[in-house]
């Protein structure tokens, strides 16, 4: 069941959902807006001949922070990692989806490529996968609204929520945009 504004506020007020910093004006009818942090991970395309998810490629990205109050410029066709300004913490019976903002999508900004789902038990900054599909550069201002979280109540609490030892939750407690850690539990079935 998708939570309404009333339910979202109740979960936050009860301390079951943590959004830090919390701004009540960000609550929408069935979601809560999240803002863009000031850190970005840009890809160093000259470091490797290809991307291989089965091995660690530590130098594949580098951290960039715009100076002062300057925006980050996302060029046409460019893909970068960023993160929410807010730290999000979910209980074991709520999951969430990060969706883009319609107004930004109409400018050509894609907020997440594939990973918009947030498991119950997750705590940390949510990494964003930003792409510019427009033909002009897009200014990304730290602190601007970048997406919205909708929350769903599970039919029962997760037996092994994100962060439990069972799944080796690679991104629990992440700070800022976190590069892929797919190599830590890469799985390939022989076909």
From Swiss-Prot:
InterPro entries: dCTP_deaminase, dUTPase-like_sf, dUTPase_trimeric. The keyword Cell inner membrane does not apply. It catalyses: dCTP + 2 H2O = dUMP + NH4(+) + diphosphate. DCTP binds at residues 101-106, 119, 127-129, 148, 162, 174. Gene3D superfamilies: 2.70.40.10. Keywords: Hydrolase, Nucleotide metabolism, Nucleotide-binding. Its EC number is 3.5.4.30. The active site is at 129 (proton donor/acceptor). Pathway: Pyrimidine metabolism; dUMP biosynthesis; dUMP from dCTP: step 1/1. The record marks 116-117 as: Important for bifunctional activity. One of its GO terms (biological process) is nucleobase-containing small molecule interconversion. It is an enzyme of class 3 (hydrolase). GO terms for molecular function: dCTP deaminase (dUMP-forming) activity; dCTP deaminase activity; nucleotide binding. CDD domains: trimeric_dUTPase. The keyword Thylakoid does not apply. It comes from the Bacteria. Belongs to the dCTP deaminase family. Bifunctional enzyme that catalyzes both the deamination of dCTP to dUTP and the hydrolysis of dUTP to dUMP without releasing the toxic dUTP intermediate. PANTHER family: DCTP DEAMINASE. Homotrimer. This is dCTP deaminase, dUMP-forming. It comes from Streptomyces avermitilis (strain ATCC 31267 / DSM 46492 / JCM 5070 / NBRC 14893 / NCIMB 12804 / NRRL 8165 / MA-4680).
């Amino acid at each position: 069941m998708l939570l309404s504004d009333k339910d979202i506020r109740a979960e936050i007020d009860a301390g079951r959902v943590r959004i830090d910093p919390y701004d009540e004006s960000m609550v929408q009818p069935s979601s809560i807006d999240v803002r863009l942090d000031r850190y970005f991970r840009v890809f160093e395309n000259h470091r490797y001949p290809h991307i291989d998810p089965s091995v660690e490629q530590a130098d594949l990205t580098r951290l960039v922070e715009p100076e002062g109050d300057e925006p980050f410029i996302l060029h046409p066709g460019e893909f970068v990692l960023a993160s929410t300004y807010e730290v999000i913490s979910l209980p074991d019976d709520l999951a969430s989806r990060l969706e883009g903002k319609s107004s930004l999508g109409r400018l050509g900004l894609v907020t997440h490529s594939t990973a918009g789902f947030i498991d119950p038990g997750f705590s940390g900054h949510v990494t964003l996968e930003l792409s510019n599909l427009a033909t002009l550069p897009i200014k990304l201002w730290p602190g601007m609204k970048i997406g919205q979280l909708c929350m769903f109540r599970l039919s029962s609490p997760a037996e092994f929520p994100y962060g439990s030892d069972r799944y080796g939750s690679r991104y629990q407690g992440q700070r800022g945009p976190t590069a892929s850690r797919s190599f830590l539990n890469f799985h390939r079935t022989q076909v």
